[in-house]
Amino acid sequence: MRLAIKRRASRGQRPGPDEKRARDMEKARPQWGNPLQFVFACISYAVGLGNVWRFPYLCQMYGGGSFLVPYLIMLIVEGMPLLYLELAVGQRMRQGSIGAWRTISPYLSGVGVASVVVSFFLSMYYNVINAWGFWYLFHSFQDPLPWSVCPLNSNRTGYDEECEKASSTQYFWYRKTLNISPSIQENGGVQWEPALCLTLAWLMVYLCILRGTESTGKVVYFTALMPYCVLIIYLVRGLTLHGATNGLMYMFTPKIEQLANPKAWINAATQIFFSLGLGFGSLIAFASYNEPSNDCQKHAVIVSVINSSTSIFASIVTFSIYGFKATFNYENCLNKVILLLTNSFDLEDGFLTASNLEEVKDYLASTYPNKYSEVFPHIRNCSLESELNTAVQGTGLAFIVYAEAIKNMEVSQLWSVLYFFMLLMLGMGSMLGNTAAILTPLTDSKVISSYLPKEAISGLVCLINCAVGMVFTMEAGNYWFDIFNDYAATLSLLLIVLVETIAVCYVYGLRRFESDLRAMTGRPLNWYWKAMWAFVSPLLIIGLFIFYLSDYILTGTLQYQAWDATQGQLVTKDYPPHALAVIGLLVASSTMCIPLVALGTFIRNRLKRGGSSPVA
């Protein structure tokens, strides 16, 4: 039986108490100061760290410019339609995720609960990135930058052994920032410096959300616009760097054969899906504060296009920096080889250059074979292509690769401050959406809001997240961060959004939803949106769900990358049983909300019917 939303009373008919309550709630609900605040809030939430550190990595992995083909196709068939769907649901129901899906059907309340659980998991670990951003920002004012050189050993007779085997940027990240343990089984204690940075990050979030849309609406102007200012500055600087063209040519040279690679399409769909923040409930929460007549279709298109354009723009910046770093390392490698051969064979200074290096190497190998064989093991194989092929994503790109490029720039402190300030703004903008996804359903709840004011609810949520997030500041914290980042949301969000599309199209009814949209926006629903919602997007999500589920099953024993201080590099290890249990709990705790809440609703309804039935 389809569960309908109660219609307004017809003329001459007195509205019932439920309808009066709904109207009072609609009137009392806070709203954005203007539509621009809503758009900026969505952009600030959607445009996040993934645009800067994951999309460039995918371009690098899957054929440079050719990756844009599946990416743009997935934007059209998946990104825009699903974004519009969530904005329309939030604006129509004018409630957070739990209330919105309960209005469509009481049996779907679990969809909103699952979104809140996933958003809670995300908030716990995501703000740790902002804590790291604060840590690097504070250290960016030092001259020289603390990650530019290796520290001396305890005897002050040479450089630290771990740093020499790795690099100064890796050492600062793994030892000075994380103080990482050798494995996930050695948790260590909470480290006070990262803990203070995490506390500061949560304090910033709390101040931004303290007054709801009143404060968030003003903050999003800054968190949305500031990253673009920094990216433009970095683009101008990046294009003037030596070797930037090498990186840009690498990015825009398409490898057409990658279009036949299924993983390129899978990753394009996944990037669109997670970059827009679908399924978390944040977009529904933001849209619930809109005017009912707001043109959410136009805003969905604007936000999705800006989000994807930012990914491409950030990639141009990243690859120009990447080209500079690769060229710097390549030329540094050549100089070391030239110096080695010049000293070993007593060559005249300036005789050996990069242009004649290979020719001279062949000559020396044929003329002095014995001596050359002694030197040969110390001659590095320098290749610009191999430097450009070194693919890094996530924290490795943000805190190691970028840091390494920045330390070699002139006025490196300035560029470091700008870069890590930009990361902070991107991270804070996303955190505003994550916390809105949690707070909106809680403040909508009459049970909770009748006992606690909004400020207290916000403070309690931030305090709990901050306390639990201290796990990520331990010596093994980065390993737990990777677990949450890899497993807390992937399958859960796919299932949530799949149920959302089915709920709107087949439970609430597509025709009925189309009628609601016509009443809100004054325009009919285009066939494109209906086809995407009813058929294409659900099938695509099912395909992604099957792929990730089979990938987890076929992978066998799950593994992680651990830092080996003795080798100065990452090594692969198997997850211990307790870590596997946490992974299973993360996936199950959110996905099981949907069937369990539906079952609980069914049982409660049956008990109510049984209790009200007359006794024979």
Curated annotation (Swiss-Prot):
It holds the Pfam family SNF. One of its GO terms (cellular component) is plasma membrane. It comes from the Eukaryota. GO terms for biological process: amino acid import across plasma membrane; amino acid transport; amino-acid betaine transport; glycine import across plasma membrane; glycine transport; L-proline import across plasma membrane; proline import across plasma membrane; proline transport. Residues 1-37, 88-103, 211-218, 287-300, 435-455, 511-533, 600-616 are cytoplasmic. Its main location: membrane. It is found in: Apical cell membrane. It catalyses: L-proline(out) + chloride(out) + 2 Na(+)(out) = L-proline(in) + chloride(in) + 2 Na(+)(in); 4-hydroxy-L-proline(out) + chloride(out) + 2 Na(+)(out) = 4-hydroxy-L-proline(in) + chloride(in) + 2 Na(+)(in); 2-methyl-2-(methylamino)propanoate(out) + chloride(out) + 2 Na(+)(out) = 2-methyl-2-(methylamino)propanoate(in) + chloride(in) + 2 Na(+)(in); L-pipecolate(out) + chloride(out) + 2 Na(+)(out) = L-pipecolate(in) + chloride(in) + 2 Na(+)(in). The keyword Transmembrane applies. The keyword Heme does not apply. Residues 1-11 have a biased composition (Basic residues). Mediates the Na(+)- and Cl(-)-dependent uptake of imino acids such as L-proline, N-methyl-L-proline and pipecolate as well as N-methylated amino acids. Also transports glycine, regulates proline and glycine homeostasis in the brain playing a role in the modulation of NMDAR currents. This is Sodium- and chloride-dependent transporter XTRP3. It comes from Rattus norvegicus (Rat).
